[in-house]
């Protein structure tokens, strides 16, 4: 399996090189040149680690399959408390794929607990011995998951940049208290798009690469622009489907819809890849909050980032520049020239419009919708009161949208974070007066619902804060060169 840039068909690399580089030299993203076909009958009874090995081996063909099996077994064992790919029935025809039972209580753990192993092995595969410096822009959950995955690894340094005042207090403390001599964390005076734009600018700056090369350092990314972030996320779509069949909730071969709360389009794109591999996926439903640039795009074919940026109670989706959409555009248009043109238009004017054929292909696989904070809060309350099911603010957005687009097909909502990462907003949605402290809110939410508080979150206020530096977006370049 080879990988090419979305913007230049002549940029071809191995999977190891794609994972190590993160971003293509031309600014494009690496995509597979083909999709391996799933062996559904053979895979349906596999454990989560066994299934992960099969999916990974189809794409990462320059990795030893035995290594991939060992890496998956080491990743998806005790750290996920036996709940990797856990599917919970909410009510008839509606299910929640709970992806927050990992060490940092967010779906990012599925990729970022495994990806460090893939990166270290990629360096071995390619005979690379330099230090790898990983730059991460985060809207909240990616930062902590990446820090937890890469902390303490020899030959690896990681720098995380998050929007100051753009995360929950729990998310901020998860990053600011991270242990490890090879980690650095910076708050950025701006929003996620500001951080992501300047991180991508650093990757494209030849002078940065030249200076770091003198010091035997190369840059890489742990954001979902890196193929190594996407491929592990394909696994849980297959696993969820197999569990629904096993439980008697879905007939074998029956299409299932998946509703995904997304901002950067990576999680839902993994579902598209699963569909291309042969999983019976009906519609992939893109759920947005008030920052509904993706909703508008899927409906109209015009991507227009020239709009007000809103801070919402679902901050991990507060994004206007959705990086992974570029991969989908390449797959449905089949034209790197078109993609390069659209991305140039976006950089220059803040918008682009795709052709009618490309839009029709997108709409054939994707539906969409959006929900604001008020609707999300009402959904949290409704799901708890009607179904005794507690969800976080991001998952609530997906439940809202799922209700508006549901067909007769079973619907799986991807639950992307623990409700205890946003305890004040969840508690308020349940009609309670939320304390000022997130930790007091955690305790009150536990009393209200009886749902256990994840241990990794409950101890955060006892850990020393190591990082409290706030920088301007333009200073990300200096941090990368430190």
Q: Residue ranges of each PLM-predicted region?
A:
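PLP-dependent amino-acid enzyme catalytic core
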Residues: 1-482
């Amino acid at each position: 399996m080879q990988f090419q840039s979305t913007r230049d068909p002549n940029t071809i690399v191995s999977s190891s090189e794609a994972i190590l580089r993160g971003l293509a030299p031309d600014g494009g993203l690496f995509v597979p040149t083909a999709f391996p076909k799933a062996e559904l009958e053979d895979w349906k009874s596999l454990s989560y680690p066994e299934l992960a090995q099969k999916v990974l081996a189809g794409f990462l063909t320059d990795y030893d399959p035995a290594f991939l099996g060992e890496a998956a077994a080491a990743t998806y064992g005790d750290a996920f408390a036996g709940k990797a790919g856990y599917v919970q029935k909410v009510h008839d025809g509606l299910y929640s794929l709970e992806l927050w039972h990992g060490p940092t209580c967010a779906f990012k753990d599925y990729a970022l607990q495994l990806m460090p192993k893939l990166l270290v092995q990629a360096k071995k595969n390619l005979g690379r011995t330099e230090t790898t410096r990983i730059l991460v822009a985060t809207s909240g959950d990616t930062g902590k998951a990446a820090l937890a995955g890469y902390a303490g690894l020899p030959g690896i340094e990681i720098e995380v940049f998050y929007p100051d005042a753009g995360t929950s207090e729990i998310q901020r403390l998860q990053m600011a208290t991270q242990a490890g001599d090879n980690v650095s964390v910076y708050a950025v005076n701006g929003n996620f798009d500001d951080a992501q734009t300047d991180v991508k600018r650093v990757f494209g700056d030849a002078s940065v690469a030249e200076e770091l090369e003198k010091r035997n350092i190369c840059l890489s990314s742990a954001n979902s622009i890196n193929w190594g972030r996407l491929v592990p996320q394909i696994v849980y779509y297959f696993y969820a489907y197999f569990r629904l069949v096993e439980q008697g909730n879905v007939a074998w071969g029956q299409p299932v819809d998946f509703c995904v709360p997304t901002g950067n389009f990576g999680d839902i794109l993994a579902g598209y890849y699963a569909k291309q591999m042969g999983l019976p996926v009906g519609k992939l439903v893109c759920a947005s909050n008030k920052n509904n640039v993706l909703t508008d795009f899927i409906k109209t074919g015009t991507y227009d980032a020239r709009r007000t940026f809103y801070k919402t109670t679902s901050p991990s989706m507060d994004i206007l520049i959705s990086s992974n959409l570029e991969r989908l555009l390449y797959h449905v248009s089949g034209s790197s020239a078109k993609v390069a043109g659209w991305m140039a238009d976006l950089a220059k004017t803040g918008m682009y419009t795709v052709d009618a054929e490309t839009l029709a292909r997108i709409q054939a696989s994707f539906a969409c919708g959006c929900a604001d904070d008020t609707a999300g809060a009402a959904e949290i309350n409704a799901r708890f009161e009607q179904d005794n099911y507690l969800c976080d603010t991001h998952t609530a957005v997906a439940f809202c949208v799922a209700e508006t687009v549901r067909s007769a097909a079973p619907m799986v909502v991807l639950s992307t974070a623990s409700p205890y990462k946003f305890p004040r907003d969840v508690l308020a949605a349940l009609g309670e007066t939320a304390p000022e402290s997130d930790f007091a809110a955690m305790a009150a939410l536990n009393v209200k619902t009886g749902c256990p508080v994840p241990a990794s979150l409950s101890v955060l206020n006892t850990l020393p804060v190591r990082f409290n530096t706030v920088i301007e977006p333009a200073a990300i370049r200096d941090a990368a060169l430190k």
